[in-house]
């Protein structure tokens, strides 16, 4: 990765993966120290999506890549996920872990932390540009990438099981970002996740 940053003319670089959300405080400290040693500014960007919506979308994308996406298979896969609760999925929606780790390693001014559902607005976009120290450029607000809309009706019992699984996530975000209207921004989580606070 460091070799990519040494290329002539490189002024800004980004790297994104949901797996970064599971990094430990120690690993984040090491990453930060390595960047500081190279005199490279580091700005974490952490976007949280409605956790139930995120699981549904992720599952849909996986099934689409396997050419298995249909309503029956999608519902059954979500039902199975809500029972098995695989660690790989749980880690990626453990927003509490990520928020705590970021707060222990970085100054709040160095991070952009927000909800995915708020990103596509001029106010949030401006805040992101400010944190990254890049000039504001108006994006094409109409362009959508990797949209995974569906007309699949997910049974209430599956949504309730997903809600039970993801309740700690909603509680953590409420505690951290209580000023936000999560009922409006995360309607699925708000409806199906029991409040644990």
Task: Tell where the protein language model's regions lie, with residue ranges.
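Short glycine/proline-rich turn/loop motifs
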Residues: 9-10, 77-84, 150-157
């Amino acid at each position: 990765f460091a070799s990519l940053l040494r290329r002539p003319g490189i002024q800004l670089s980004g790297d994104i993966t949901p797996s970064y959300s599971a990094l430990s405080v120690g690993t984040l400290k090491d990453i930060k120290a390595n960047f500081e040693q190279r005199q490279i500014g580091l700005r974490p960007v952490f976007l949280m999506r409605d956790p139930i919506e995120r699981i549904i979308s992720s599952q849909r994308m996986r099934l689409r890549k396997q050419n298995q996406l249909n309503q029956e298979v999608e519902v059954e896969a979500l039902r199975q996920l809500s029972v098995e609760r695989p660690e790989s999925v749980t880690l990626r929606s453990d927003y509490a872990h990520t928020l705590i780790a970021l707060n222990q390693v970085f100054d709040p001014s160095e991070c952009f932390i927000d909800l995915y559902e708020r990103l596509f607005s001029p106010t949030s976009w401006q805040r992101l540009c400010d944190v990254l120290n890049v000039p504001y450029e108006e994006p094409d607000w109409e362009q959508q990438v990797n949209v995974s809309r569906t007309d699949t009706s997910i049974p209430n019992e599956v949504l309730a099981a997903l809600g039970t699984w993801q309740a700690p996530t909603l509680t953590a975000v409420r505690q951290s970002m209580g000023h936000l209207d999560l009922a409006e921004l995360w309607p699925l989580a708000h409806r199906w996740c029991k409040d644990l606070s």
